[in-house]
Curated annotation (Swiss-Prot):
Disulfide bonds: none annotated. The lineage of its organism: Archaea, Methanobacteriati, Methanobacteriota, Methanomada group, Methanococci. Part of the 30S ribosomal subunit. GO terms for molecular function: rRNA binding; structural constituent of ribosome. It comes from Methanococcus maripaludis (strain DSM 14266 / JCM 13030 / NBRC 101832 / S2 / LL). This is Small ribosomal subunit protein uS11.
Length: 124
Protein backbone atom coordinates (compact mmCIF):
# COMPACT_ATOMS: atom_id res chain seq x y z
CA UNK A 1 0.00 0.00 0.00
CA UNK A 2 1.42 3.37 -0.99
CA UNK A 3 1.79 5.99 1.68
CA UNK A 4 0.60 9.33 0.34
CA UNK A 5 1.02 12.39 2.55
CA UNK A 6 -1.17 15.47 2.73
CA UNK A 7 -1.29 18.68 4.73
CA UNK A 8 -4.37 19.62 6.78
CA UNK A 9 -4.73 23.31 7.63
CA UNK A 10 -7.13 23.77 10.55
CA UNK A 11 -8.29 27.36 11.08
CA UNK A 12 -10.13 27.40 14.41
CA UNK A 13 -11.60 30.71 15.54
CA UNK A 14 -14.38 31.32 18.03
CA UNK A 15 -16.81 31.84 15.12
CA UNK A 16 -16.02 28.92 12.80
CA UNK A 17 -13.68 26.00 12.12
CA UNK A 18 -12.30 25.46 8.62
CA UNK A 19 -10.41 22.33 7.50
CA UNK A 20 -8.44 22.61 4.27
CA UNK A 21 -6.45 19.69 2.82
CA UNK A 22 -3.62 20.36 0.38
CA UNK A 23 -0.66 18.46 -1.02
CA UNK A 24 2.64 18.76 0.87
CA UNK A 25 3.64 21.93 -0.98
CA UNK A 26 0.35 23.60 -0.05
CA UNK A 27 -0.23 24.63 -3.66
CA UNK A 28 -2.98 22.22 -4.69
CA UNK A 29 -6.26 22.07 -2.76
CA UNK A 30 -7.64 18.57 -2.35
CA UNK A 31 -10.68 19.26 -0.12
CA UNK A 32 -12.13 22.04 2.02
CA UNK A 33 -14.89 21.74 4.65
CA UNK A 34 -16.07 24.23 7.27
CA UNK A 35 -18.21 23.97 10.39
CA UNK A 36 -20.85 26.11 8.68
CA UNK A 37 -21.27 23.46 5.98
CA UNK A 38 -22.15 20.87 8.65
CA UNK A 39 -24.56 22.56 11.08
CA UNK A 40 -27.64 24.70 10.52
CA UNK A 41 -27.33 27.25 13.32
CA UNK A 42 -24.70 29.95 13.03
CA UNK A 43 -23.89 29.73 16.74
CA UNK A 44 -22.82 26.07 16.32
CA UNK A 45 -20.26 26.65 13.54
CA UNK A 46 -17.30 26.72 15.93
CA UNK A 47 -18.51 23.89 18.17
CA UNK A 48 -16.43 20.73 18.68
CA UNK A 49 -19.29 18.68 17.20
CA UNK A 50 -19.20 20.61 13.90
CA UNK A 51 -15.40 20.31 13.78
CA UNK A 52 -15.61 16.57 14.44
CA UNK A 53 -18.16 15.98 11.67
CA UNK A 54 -16.14 18.17 9.28
CA UNK A 55 -13.02 16.11 10.06
CA UNK A 56 -14.86 12.84 9.36
CA UNK A 57 -16.12 14.27 6.07
CA UNK A 58 -12.64 15.44 5.09
CA UNK A 59 -11.17 12.04 6.03
CA UNK A 60 -13.57 10.36 3.56
CA UNK A 61 -12.63 12.84 0.82
CA UNK A 62 -8.92 12.25 1.50
CA UNK A 63 -9.32 8.48 1.36
CA UNK A 64 -11.02 8.83 -2.04
CA UNK A 65 -7.94 10.73 -3.29
CA UNK A 66 -5.58 8.13 -1.79
CA UNK A 67 -4.18 10.19 1.09
CA UNK A 68 -3.81 8.22 4.31
CA UNK A 69 -1.22 10.24 6.25
CA UNK A 70 -1.20 13.95 7.08
CA UNK A 71 0.73 16.71 8.78
CA UNK A 72 -1.49 19.19 10.64
CA UNK A 73 -1.13 22.98 10.83
CA UNK A 74 -3.40 24.57 13.44
CA UNK A 75 -4.08 28.30 13.14
CA UNK A 76 -5.99 30.70 15.38
CA UNK A 77 -7.15 34.17 14.36
CA UNK A 78 -3.91 35.75 15.58
CA UNK A 79 -2.63 39.22 14.82
CA UNK A 80 -4.29 41.71 17.19
CA UNK A 81 -7.07 39.21 17.96
CA UNK A 82 -7.07 35.92 19.90
CA UNK A 83 -3.92 33.85 19.67
CA UNK A 84 -5.63 30.76 21.10
CA UNK A 85 -7.29 28.28 18.72
CA UNK A 86 -11.06 27.92 19.03
CA UNK A 87 -12.89 24.94 20.54
CA UNK A 88 -12.96 23.01 17.27
CA UNK A 89 -9.20 22.54 16.81
CA UNK A 90 -8.64 19.71 19.25
CA UNK A 91 -11.87 17.94 18.29
CA UNK A 92 -10.89 18.03 14.61
CA UNK A 93 -7.44 16.52 15.23
CA UNK A 94 -8.90 13.80 17.44
CA UNK A 95 -11.58 12.97 14.85
CA UNK A 96 -8.98 12.71 12.07
CA UNK A 97 -6.99 10.13 14.01
CA UNK A 98 -10.17 8.27 14.95
CA UNK A 99 -11.14 8.13 11.27
CA UNK A 100 -7.98 6.12 10.55
CA UNK A 101 -5.81 8.92 9.16
CA UNK A 102 -2.22 8.70 10.43
CA UNK A 103 -1.00 12.03 11.81
CA UNK A 104 2.64 12.99 11.37
CA UNK A 105 3.37 16.36 12.95
CA UNK A 106 1.13 18.96 14.49
CA UNK A 107 2.35 22.55 14.38
CA UNK A 108 0.95 25.95 15.30
CA UNK A 109 0.74 28.43 12.41
CA UNK A 110 -0.96 31.31 14.25
CA UNK A 111 0.31 34.68 13.00
CA UNK A 112 1.95 36.55 15.88
CA UNK A 113 2.90 40.21 15.37
CA UNK A 114 6.46 41.28 16.13
CA UNK A 115 5.35 44.68 17.43
CA UNK A 116 2.84 45.43 14.68
CA UNK A 117 0.01 47.96 14.75
CA UNK A 118 -1.32 49.63 17.90
CA UNK A 119 -4.00 47.53 19.64
CA UNK A 120 -7.41 49.14 19.96
CA UNK A 121 -8.84 50.77 23.09
CA UNK A 122 -8.47 48.63 26.23
CA UNK A 123 -5.60 46.47 24.94
CA UNK A 124 -3.25 49.45 24.52
Amino acid sequence: MSQKWGLVHIYASYNNTILHVTDLTGAETIAKVSGGMIVRNQRDESSPYAAMQAAFKIADLMRDKGIDQVHVKVRATGGQKSKNPGPGAQAAIRALSRAGIRIGRIEDATPIPHDGTTPKRKNR
